[in-house]
A protein has these predicted regions:
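N-terminal helix-loop segment corresponding to the beta1-alpha1 unit
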Residues: 1-123
Length: 124
């Protein structure tokens, strides 16, 4: 997609609310947005139900790629770090402290990639 943000790569880390909305807007303006989704776990749909999941997701998650990862798996965390190394920005929407517990907090990511823009959206 073309737009003023064409050529920028953004990694979206989970959550609901403002994070996916922000990622949608960046994608609409041409950024290459990669959403990190949880690997299928026991058929959970994040408590949204089929109706809400299909309607909201089809709107909010449009225009971006998705990678399924298990952020508690060392191999998948390494894959995520490799994605971040090639990114321009991060959008993080987890509860406070989650990224740090996963070993992916701002200190770790910014030490690896000092020019990274780290966007944090807290709703909790």
């Amino acid at each position: 997609m073309s737009g003023p943000l064409q050529g920028l790569k953004v990694i979206e880390f989970g959550g609901i609310g403002p994070g996916p909305f922000c990622a949608m807007m960046l994608s609409d303006m041409g950024a290459d947005v990669i959403r990190l989704d949880r690997k299928a776990d026991k058929g959970k749909d994040r408590g949204e139900g089929a109706f809400l999941a299909s309607g909201r997701r089809s709107v909010l998650h449009r225009g971006r790629r998705s990678v399924a990862v298990d952020l508690k798996s060392p191999a998948d965390v390494q894959r995520v770090l490799e994605l971040v190394d090639g990114a321009d920005a991060i959008i993080e929407g987890f509860r406070p402290g989650v990224m740090e517990r996963l070993g992916l907090g701002p200190d770790v990511l910014l030490a690896r990639h000092p020019r990274l823009v780290y966007g944090l959206s807290l709703i909790h």
